[in-house]
UniProtKB/Swiss-Prot annotation:
This is UDP-N-acetylenolpyruvoylglucosamine reductase. Belongs to the MurB family. It is an enzyme of class 1 (oxidoreductase). One of its GO terms (cellular component) is cytosol. GO terms for molecular function: FAD binding; UDP-N-acetylmuramate dehydrogenase activity. The active site is at 163, 233 (proton donor), 328. Keywords: Cell cycle, Cell division, Cell shape, Cell wall biogenesis/degradation, Cytoplasm, FAD, Flavoprotein, NADP, Oxidoreductase, Peptidoglycan synthesis. It comes from Vibrio vulnificus (strain CMCP6). Cell wall formation. Its EC number is 1.3.1.98. It catalyses: UDP-N-acetyl-alpha-D-muramate + NADP(+) = UDP-N-acetyl-3-O-(1-carboxyvinyl)-alpha-D-glucosamine + NADPH + H(+). Residues 16-187 form the FAD-binding PCMH-type domain. InterPro entries: FAD-bd_PCMH (IPR016166), FAD-bd_PCMH-like_sf (IPR036318), FAD-bd_PCMH_sub1 (IPR016167), FAD-bd_PCMH_sub2 (IPR016169), MurB (IPR003170), MurB_C (IPR011601), MurB_C_sf (IPR036635), Oxid_FAD_bind_N (IPR006094).
């Protein structure tokens, strides 16, 4: 286990913005994880657990220790009705989904090509095309940071919500996700109700056909972070009450939204697109020309470029629709997590 000092974070997050961390260490086991958190030299320093860095924006140099989760490995077991997959927290999520499909195991195919590690999936409750992590989760294994005990949380204990979980609230900064357990029924049912997935002929429906269609759509709509720095969907789809929705529907008949319990989930990409932001650039940051929900590092951008562009978008959407956009991407300052509203106050 090598502890690096004053290291560039550019290779460790998909926005690929030049920013540095005072310390960085890659951990390959729970014991190494404990060693870092128990180290008296680091005890008073802020720490950040990082997986693939696919959902973060470093707004300033990080003054503490970035701990990169490299815990790897997966096991498969089964009974008459289910497949059970245990995946270590550092396992690459897209590779895990593809591996399952290749094994003939269905249930994860709608979540194909979502960048990140298995350990990040429950924190965000990742989701796409009608499926969320909570739908396939059996348990989440965590390391408590106060006494270094290990606990197994049931899906119910994780308190999953829309891009939300207990790890953003009661357990925020209290634990590290070291593994996840997935439970996938052997009696597979296609989830093809979303958009392009409906194009698959009924006789061709299979985990593999949905997997390929999801990959095709994502590659067509979303830029590859290896080619253009980005963190995927920058904003959450806002949830509004039905009264607000009906007012907007009367004024904007083509508004795109879906039921979310007693409320409505509005397509943030549509809102941003209708405010004419596709292709708009601030400094080196740009709204992707094909997908308004994605902000990119188009030309050696700075974090401030992204912040300014995101602020312009939020203001425009609020002025036109009275909807407050919330960023899905995590903002990391010099000592830990922050948010766009705080940064705007500071500036």
């Amino acid at each position: 286990m090598q502890i690096k000092q004053n290291i560039s974070l550019k290779p460790y997050h998909t926005f690929a913005i030049e920013q540095c961390s005072h310390y960085l260490v890659e951990v390959g086991s729970v014991d190494e994880l404990v060693d870092i958190y128990a180290n008296p030299d680091f005890r008073e320093l802020p720490k950040l657990i990082l997986g693939s860095g696919s959902n973060v924006l470093f707004t300033q140099p990080f003054s503490g220790v970035v701990v990169v989760n490299r815990l790897s490995g997966k096991t498969l077991s089964e009974d008459e009705s289910f497949y059970y997959i245990h995946a270590e927290g550092g396992e690459d999520w897209p590779n895990l989904v593809e591996w399952c499909v290749q094994q003939g195991i269905g249930g994860l195919e709608n979540l194909a090509l979502i960048p990140g590690c298995a350990g990040s999936a429950p924190i965000q409750n990742i989701g796409a095309y009608g499926v969320e992590f909570k739908d396939v989760c059996q348990y989440v294994d965590i390391l408590m940071l106060d006494d270094f005990s290990q606990r197994r949380l049931s899906a119910e204990e994780c308190q999953f919500g829309y891009r939300d979980s207990v790890f953003k609230h009661a357990l925020y900064n209290q634990c590290v996700v070291i593994a996840v357990g997935l439970k996938l029924p052997k009696t597979w049912q296609a989830n093809n109700s979303y958009g392009p997935l409906q194009e698959i002929a009924e006789h061709e429906l299979s985990p593999m056909s949905i997997f390929h269609k999801v990959c095709e759509v994502r590659r067509e709509k979303l830029p590859d972070p290896k080619q253009i720095g980005n963190a995927g969907s920058f904003f959450k789809n806002p949830i509004i009450d039905k009264a607000h929705w009906q007012q907007l529907k009367a004024q904007f008949p083509n508004i795109v939204a879906y039921p979310a319990g007693e409320q409505m989930k509005v397509a943030a990409g549509w809102l941003i697109d209708q405010c004419d932001f596709k292709g708009v650039q601030v400094g080196g940051a740009q709204v992707h020309p094909k997908q308004a929900l994605v902000l990119t590092n188009a030309q050696s951008c700075t974090a401030q470029d992204i912040i300014q562009l995101a602020s312009l978008i939020c203001d425009a959407v609020w002025d036109k629709y009275q909807i407050a956009l919330e960023h899905e991407v995590r903002f990391i300052s010099t000592v830990g997590e922050t948010c766009l509203s705080e940064l705007r106050v500071e500036s």
